[in-house]
Amino acid sequence: MAWPEKIRRLSVHGTLPYHRQQQRSGSQLRSLLMFGVGENLSLGKLFPGGCKLLGVLDYQDAPLNKFPVAVVDLYHLRYLSLRNTKVTMVPGYIIGKLHNLETLDLKKTCVRELPVEILKLQKLRHLLVYQFKVKGYAQFYSKHGFKAPNEIGNLKSLQKLCFVEANQDCGMITRQLGELSQLRRLGILKLREEDGKAFCLSIERLTNLHALSVASEGENKVIDLAFLCSPPPFLQRLYLSGRLQELPSWIQSLHSLSRLFLKWSCLKYDPLVYLQDLPSLAHLELLQVYDGDTLHFVCGKFKKLKVLGLDKFDGLKEVIVGEDTMPCLERLSIGRCELLKKVPSGIEHLNKLKVLEFFDMPDELMKTICPHGPGKDYCKISHIPNVYSTYWRDDGWDVYALDSFSRDCSPR
């Protein structure tokens, strides 16, 4: 297969049918994207003469088991993605020579540690090393990050850093984070309670931060964020996973916050009063956040909220929706609240609601809204175009539209 001598951008899908190596030149190639390539279609075989001007190399979804050695000669390489491959380690003698690298994408790989040579990449802006292992509902240990070199703060150009495991070397990593003043997105796993103060002091220095994700060492371990006095002023997305002794008071000052996920917080009081006046909040997810029996969405609050998820409130018996609250809400999901036997009181006020979804909710609740049975509350949700009941069964999701329920209010 021949192509122009001065080709600069190339996308390869699958395999090349006719391997005539002398017809392929990569001398002018700047960008190479490989999708679903065969195991034998390596960079060296594709371009025997090399492609030393290559700046972008994307191996996403390729059947790679090892870090591609051929990249050691790609001095001009700025972008390298090995996303969703089986690569397990990054050789220091290779990565340390890619001095112009700006993006290293190792998402969905098996890499769990980076060599100290990564610190030589002073132009590195995006460092993404993590993997999700989700089966069914959200699980605390479903996300795996990486161990970073202690001097990670030397990478002054970093803008995205996800997900670093912080429970190493007596909290050295948490102190180093404050040196990364250009960070816009930061993901931290396994933050120890005793490192909370050092972590907060570092976060206060990250004034350009737009997204912050923090997880404790375990779902019963505390995230201590009480020492954070001046949060990043432009923070838009905040994800906290782990016990909170109390909801950080500084959250109320985040006027740019549009997305907030709180998981396994186990608060003793209703957190909504501290969140309801956030002016930009559009997406709120709460999982095992509150031990009480009532959630009250007060009249006239949550003005911009479009998506709301409530999951695993073990003591929850009642949800109250006041008039003119959540006027923009389009999607509401409620899951695994075993004591909640009726739909939210006042749900009929949510005029813009397009999707209402229940996950493994009690049969008693579903019977109250069944259109073919005694559903006394069906009129409250009849204005919602899409109503679903979803169940986790046999390692998969079963989704039923409400109008498919039989007269005994069970999925057909």
Where are these regions (language model features)?
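Surface-exposed helical/coil interface segments that assemble multiprotein signaling complexes
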Residues: 1-73, 79, 93-96, 103, ...
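Well-ordered beta-strand segments characteristic of repetitive beta-sheet solenoids
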Residues: 12, 34, 80-82, 104-106, ...
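Conserved "Asn-ladder"/turn position within leucine-rich repeats
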Residues: 15, 37-38, 62, 85, ...
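Canonical leucine-rich repeat
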Residues: 42-43, 67, 90, 114, ...
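Leucine-rich repeat
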Residues: 131-147, 167-170, 192-196, 218-221, ...
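Beta-propeller domains
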Residues: 232-272, 276
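C-terminal capping region of solenoid repeat domains
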Residues: 351-412
